[in-house]
């Protein structure tokens, strides 16, 4: 072999066998510059180097495992510029694609199975253009290594493969001692220690040749990968008779999810891979039964303690997660894999994990199984998609983590066995605030360490889960010292706390504690400045509560602020007395009227059933309701009080022949005549319509004593909020361009217009009362004509 000053390339061909009587022949082929020129000639001649027929120039195919007609032959791939095909195996020279530094030798490592040679292969010439390269015999396991070499497997034909990471290469000395090619870095076919084991497991030990290219370790990412958002190496090669795993370079391994890998004493890549599979995310993915999994095998940066190797096919460490979304049909189906970053997987695992959980464990495996997150999964054992748990995952022989069991929260879940499930979490997780139960589940039958996560749904009837009770505050609260046993609704106490002055709060609470009749009677019997006529226990409780609510005010028994509160209470009582005495004066002077005017009441509970009679005074001329509708004489300041002003009754309508409809939302149970609603819709603006409808909703006696929102300082109560809300909804429906929300500008204008109309009505009533006091009592002309001196029924008020 001639020495060269330039860059030299070598090809190492190794024949492996467990027979001690045979020797190994390793052919080192020097790739010179003339090899590049003769690449096309070599490809056309298809020169092969065989172990069975060393002197034959024709192509001979070895007996591959499962070499029947249905078995796929190794895939012929052409990534480089030059290629040499040997015994059905094609190796490639990628040196033309990537720049190589000077002085760096490139080695091409071709590893052949034991069935290709009998250890004592006679020297065979290797045709490389016009050169004949001599053969060099080496020991069976002696290999030439490069610092950046790597072993790969051939894929099956027609498969799509995703990359898999292998770690660093173990030294040759260790391979000579152990007689095995399995290590955490390079996983190849295991050579049996004895001849009997090899004969027994001949079908398992055979595999395709493996090829190593030093230039395959260059950093490169393809532009047209199957997954555009994830980097894929340009020179990934997959292999193995039963495996569909691929290899990626260490340069791209930093973007992958680190997971646990095989220990040094575990056997082969095909039978014992420490891989993590990730299935596809898209929707409506239908895959047939028996389809192989395509998975990523990422470069591990985490350690896993050693464990005795088992050659069974089920000895895997797999993180198993089912499909995320979509409709997947078919039994035992699998989908393509997608690289998912750790932060994406953690977010899905922590916050979006509905569904039921099961544990899929077979013969010494560490399995994490998560069911489908969404979509319809109709198969009994649907395809599983695989997501990483965490970037700092470690696996030991006995699972020494603290296992956290999330209680299963499902609808109508009475199964005690499914009430809780354990999940192994590392400190990197950001846990949501959940009620958890600590429970360790151990299964020593197959030495299985299971990690299972429960679902979080609405209701939970399981016995192992903890339920949170809703604390409903009590309806009533004590006023002052609880020993006084003075209770009011808490809503009133909250309203008092929002008031600015204790005087307003005192008037509000007095109106709540005492009825109107008690306040009026107390103020009539004694002097108005003396409030001791009221219940002293309630008044003391009122003062104590005000002192607690307004600590900066002087609310002692003789304090300044408390005296102001008493003055405000007396002013309110005086207003109530004056308003109550105003209407009965006219009634006493007109005892012959059929219906007397009821006493004014601002109490909200007394509004229903309170209406003025027809012609409550001689000034109010009775008018038929039908005549008023014909004349449309429904002005707010009219002296006549028609029957239409009475509150509508849903049980007994005023006119059975009149069409009625709901006012506002139907659940408010407020009905109004359709003619009234039609007239209200014809108003030019919302404020005029509200001013018209307020007289149809309430009687005149209620309006003169009330206000829209009330004013306790002046003795005015708020109108029925249910009817006010119905009015606002009606206006909002018929005037959509107006801002008629609770705090809307147009609704405030409507409230101002309603209050203005009520003030006008109140002023007219007072002016009528003043005129009636100045004039003598006059009997109406109708009664004078009917009454005669000798008629005994003349003085009967019933006539």
From Swiss-Prot:
Residues 34-63 have a biased composition (Polar residues). Residues 483-582, 667-765 form the BEN domain. The keyword Nucleus applies. Keywords: Nucleus, Repeat. GO terms for molecular function: DNA binding. It is found in: Nucleus. GO terms for cellular component: nucleus. InterPro entries: BEN_domain. The keyword ATP-binding does not apply. Residues 603-613 have a biased composition (Basic and acidic residues). It holds the Pfam family BEN. Residues 32-73, 584-616, 629-656, 768-799 are annotated as: Disordered. Residues 586-595 have a biased composition (Basic residues). This is BEN domain-containing protein 2. The lineage of its organism: Eukaryota, Metazoa, Chordata, Craniata, Vertebrata. The gene is BEND2.
């Amino acid at each position: 072999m001639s020495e060269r000053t330039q860059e030299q390339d070598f090809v190492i061909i190794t024949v492996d066998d467990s027979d001690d009587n045979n020797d190994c022949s390793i052919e080192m082929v020097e790739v010179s510059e003339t090899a590049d020129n003769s690449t096309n000639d070599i490809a056309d001649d298809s020169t092969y180097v065989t172990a069975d027929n060393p002197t034959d120039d024709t192509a001979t195919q070895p007996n591959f495992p499962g070499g029947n007609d249905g078995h796929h032959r190794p895939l012929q791939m052409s990534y480089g510029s030059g290629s040499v095909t040997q015994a059905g195996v094609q190796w490639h020279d990628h040196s033309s694609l990537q720049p190589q530094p000077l002085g760096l030798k490139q080695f091409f490592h071709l590893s052949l199975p034991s069935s290709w040679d009998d250890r004592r292969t006679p020297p065979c010439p290797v045709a490389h253009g016009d050169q004949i390269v001599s053969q060099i015999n080496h020991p069976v396991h002696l290999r030439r290594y490069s610092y950046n070499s790597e072993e790969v497997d051939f894929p099956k034909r027609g498969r799509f493969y995703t990359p898999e990471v292998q770690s660093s290469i173990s030294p040759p000395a260790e391979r000579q001692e152990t007689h095995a090619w399995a290590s955490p870095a390079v996983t190849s076919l295991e050579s049996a220690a004895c001849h009997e084991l090899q004969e027994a497991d001949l079908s398992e030990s055979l595999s395709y040749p493996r090829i190593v290219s030093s230039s395959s370790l260059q950093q490169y990412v393809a532009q047209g990968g199957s997954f555009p958002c994830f980097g894929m190496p340009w020179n990934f090669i997959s292999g193995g008779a039963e495996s569909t795993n691929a290899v990626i370079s260490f340069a791209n391994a930093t973007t992958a999810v680190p997971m646990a890998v095989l220990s040094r004493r575990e056997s082969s890549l095909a039978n014992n891979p420490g891989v993590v599979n990730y299935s596809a995310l898209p929707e409506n993915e239908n895959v047939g039964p028996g389809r192989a999994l395509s998975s990523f095998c990422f470069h591990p940066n985490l350690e896993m303690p050693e464990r005795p190797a088992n050659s069974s096919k089920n000895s895997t460490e797999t993180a198993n997660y089912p499909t995320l979304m979509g409709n997947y049909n078919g039994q035992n189906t699998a989908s393509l894999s997608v690289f998912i970053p750790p932060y994406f997987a953690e977010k899905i695992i922590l916050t979006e994990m509905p569904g039921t959980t099961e544990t899929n464990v077979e013969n010494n495996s560490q399995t994490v199984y998560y069911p489908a997150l969404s979509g319809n999964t109709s198969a009994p054992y649907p395809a599983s998609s695989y997501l990483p748990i965490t970037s700092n995952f470690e696996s030991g022989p006995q699972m020494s983590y603290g296992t956290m069991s999330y209680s299963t929260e499902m609808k109508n879940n009475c199964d005690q066995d499914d009430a809780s499930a354990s999940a192994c979490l590392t400190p990197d997780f950001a846990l949501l605030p959940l009620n958890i139960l600590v429970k360790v589940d151990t299964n020593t039958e197959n030495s299985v360490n299971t990690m299972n996560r429960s679902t979080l749904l609405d209701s939970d009837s399981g016995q192992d889960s903890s339920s949170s009770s809703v604390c409903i505050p009590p309806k009533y609260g004590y006023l002052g010292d609880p020993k006084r046993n003075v209770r009011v609704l808490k809503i009133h106490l909250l309203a008092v706390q929002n008031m600015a002055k204790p005087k307003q709060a005192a008037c509000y609470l007095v109106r709540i504690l005492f009825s109107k009749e008690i306040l009026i009677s107390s103020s009539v019997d004694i002097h108005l400045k003396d409030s001791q006529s009221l219940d002293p226990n309630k008044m003391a409780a009122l003062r104590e509560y005000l002192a607690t609510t307004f600590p900066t005010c002087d609310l002692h028994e003789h304090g300044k602020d408390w005296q102001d509160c008493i003055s405000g209470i007396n002013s309110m009582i005086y207003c109530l007395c004056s308003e109550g005495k105003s209407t009965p004066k006219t009634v006493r002077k007109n005892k012959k009227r059929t219906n007397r005017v009821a006493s004014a009441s601002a109490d909200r509970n007394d509004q229903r059933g309170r209406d003025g009679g027809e012609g409550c005074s001689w000034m109010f001329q009775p008018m038929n309701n039908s005549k008023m509708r014909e004349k449309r004489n429904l002005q707010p300041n009219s002296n006549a009080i028609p029957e239409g002003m009475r509150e509508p009754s849903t049980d007994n309508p005023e006119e059975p022949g009149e069409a009625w409809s709901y006012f506002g939302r139907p659940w408010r149970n407020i009905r109004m005549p359709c003619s009234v609603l039609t007239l209200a819709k014809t108003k030019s603006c919302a404020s005029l319509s509200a001013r018209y409808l307020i007289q149809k909703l309430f009687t005149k006696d209620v309006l003169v004593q009330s206000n829209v929102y009330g004013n306790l300082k002046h003795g005015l109560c708020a109108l029925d909020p249910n009817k006010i809300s119905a009015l606002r909804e009606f206006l909002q429906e018929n005037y959509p361009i107006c801002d008629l929300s609770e705090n809307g500008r147009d609704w405030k204008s409507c409230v101002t217009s309603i209050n203005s109309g009520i003030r006008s009505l109140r002023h007219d009533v007072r002016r009528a009362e003043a005129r009636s006091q100045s004039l003598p009592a006059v009997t109406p002309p109708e009664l004078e004509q009917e009454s005669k001196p000798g008629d005994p029924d003349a003085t009967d008020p019933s006539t």
